[in-house]
Amino acid sequence: MALDVKKYPFIKSLDDELKKYGGGITLTDLLLNSTTLIDQAKDRIQKTKSGDELPHYVSYNEPVLVFYTTLLSLAILNDVKLIRRYAYAEAKQFRSLLHTENEENLLEISKLLDLKINRCDPIKFYLEKKRRIIQKEFCVHFIDYLKYTKDLKEDWKLSGQILHKGYVYLDKNQLIGLIAESIKSKIVEMIRPLNLKEIPEKLKSLIERRGIIPPCIENILAKEKLNEEEIRTLITFYIDIGKGLSGIVSIMKKYNVSNVEDLYRKYRGDKGTRYIVYSCAKMKQLGLCVSSCNVKNPLQLYFLSNE
């Protein structure tokens, strides 16, 4: 079965993806024409910062372009720690998909990542602690194994592996682990070569743009205790700007709100029931408006502040 590029967009080059738009079209051209891809990329980056799981790429209309737009965005932001966190989060997301793949697809992905892993004659051994027979049918030369696992934990030490005639034998879970580690390294490497001098200032501005927190939200954040409407306003605001559950829990911690997770699920809802932050008119009725911002909704100030 052929690999699904919608699940693993890194297996397709950006140049190949852009061919469907005709000659001469660049990613920059597409991004300057519409901010949808930038918004989706920034959402992935925000989820990384918040510690939330990244959505699978199959949820996007243009998964390959979202992938490369995110890499471009990270290169422009130029935050080494964030890049590493993102690569880790992506590897984790891809790893969950790898567990659903058959062995042929796993070996194909390994090949695309330049991992020298092969299917070998199965080797069986008795694991005394677990009192069962273990079978491993993938193998990699020990020199390559050391290279692939140099940044991994103790469990991956060569001394703890099955070594036979110069080859380390792996089971399916170990194979997936090496693929995920290779994906993480590949993502970091793919960000480095980007030539930032060739990126228009307008595009840099779109990616680097950070919204201003509205005065009404700042005023609520400054309080020591919150009433029900203030709690609702904060949670819906942060949901609407893309902050994940863990980030919202962290913000609400100081107010001793015990049911943040339940409120998050309630206000996030689905497409038919999702809540949005109150309009400025409603905020005035509730006594939560503290400034004349000349907008109809606090979200306008956040999203349009630096355009």
Curated annotation (Swiss-Prot):
Cofactor note as given: Binds 1 [4Fe-4S] cluster.
Needed co-factor(s): [4Fe-4S] cluster
Protein name: DNA primase large subunit PriL
Similarity remark: Belongs to the eukaryotic-type primase large subunit family.
Listed GO MF terms: 4 iron, 4 sulfur cluster binding; DNA-directed RNA polymerase activity; metal ion binding
One GO term (biological process): DNA replication, synthesis of primer
Residues reported in the UniProt entry to bind [4Fe-4S] cluster: C216, C280, C289, C293
InterPro entries: DNA_primase_lsu_euk/arc (IPR007238), DNA_primase_lsu_PriL (IPR023642)
Signal peptide coordinates: none
Keyword line: 4Fe-4S, DNA replication, Iron, Iron-sulfur, Metal-binding, Primosome
Entry function: Regulatory subunit of DNA primase, an RNA polymerase that catalyzes the synthesis of short RNA molecules used as primers for DNA polymerase during DNA replication. Stabilizes and modulates the activity of the small subunit, increasing the rate of DNA synthesis, and conferring RNA synthesis capability. The DNA polymerase activity may enable DNA primase to also catalyze primer extension after primer synthesis. May also play a role in DNA repair. Possesses a template-independent 3'-terminal nucleotidyl transferase activity.
Gene behind this protein: priL
Gene Ontology CC annotation, any one: primosome complex
